[in-house]
């Protein structure tokens, strides 16, 4: 065994003059020096669920037809706090009118939402940014990532094995920080055709492409 990383932490020894819960709890504690499965236990098995529904129909004479499509994608990434959700709705139709006019149109609406814990380049020392992946992979094998407390009780901040607490605990990142993006988009086309005769027609087309994107980054 070796001295517990929180018991020998210069950061905890100095924080509030050493009068803090973790310093008092782990000072003098011993820590089993052995390999831990920190990387394997931090990540999880991902999953993907895809659902689709289609409805279509037409009149007996074939002059009117329609179709409706709905799709749902729910993806859970192998990194905790990472996921993607998407909903799509498409509607289309065509009507051949008795006065030589034909109207047809389609509309597609999609909503996509993506979330992820902080990701950045990493040197394992916090100087290039805040990287959940980097902080996991730079964790030594003899440090039990999943067995160490990750929150400082007094202020809710991150605590990790480094003597100076100079990188963010990946478990704290997942619980307290997130980046995300939500995108809404609408595409639609409409056309109106007038047939003068079998060889001549006039068509008017209108298209719309509307896009809205919102990004968020937060940390407690």
How would you label these PLM feature ranges?
Residues 39, 173-177, 192:
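Short coil/turn segments at secondary-structure junctions
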Residues 57-63, 72:
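A generic beta-sheet turn/junction motif
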Residues 1-33, 77-82, 88-185, 203-220:
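Surface-exposed loop/interface segments of Gram-negative outer-membrane beta-barrel transport/assembly proteins
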């Amino acid at each position: 065994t070796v001295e517990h990383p929180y018991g020998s932490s210069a950061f905890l020894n100095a924080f509030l003059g050493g009068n803090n819960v973790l310093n008092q709890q782990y000072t003098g504690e011993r820590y089993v020096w052995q390999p831990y499965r920190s990387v394997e236990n931090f990540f999880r098995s991902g999953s993907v669920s895809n659902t689709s529904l289609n409805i279509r129909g037409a009149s007996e004479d074939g002059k009117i037809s329609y179709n409706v499509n709905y799709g749902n994608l729910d993806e859970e990434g192998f990194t905790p706090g990472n996921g993607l959700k998407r909903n799509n709705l498409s509607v289309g139709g065509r009507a051949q009118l008795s006065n030589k006019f034909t109207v047809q149109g389609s509309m597609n609406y999609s909503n996509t939402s993506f979330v992820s814990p902080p990701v950045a380049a990493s040197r394992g020392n916090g100087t290039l940014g805040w990287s959940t992946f980097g902080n996991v992979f730079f964790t030594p094998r003899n440090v039990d990532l999943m067995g160490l407390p990750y929150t400082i009780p007094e202020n809710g901040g991150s605590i990790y094995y480094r003597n100076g607490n100079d990188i963010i605990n990946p478990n704290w990142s997942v619980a307290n920080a997130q980046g995300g993006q939500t995108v809404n988009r609408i595409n639609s086309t409409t056309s109106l055709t007038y047939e003068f005769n079998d060889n001549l027609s006039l068509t008017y087309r209108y298209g719309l492409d509307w896009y809205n994107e919102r990004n968020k980054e937060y940390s407690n």
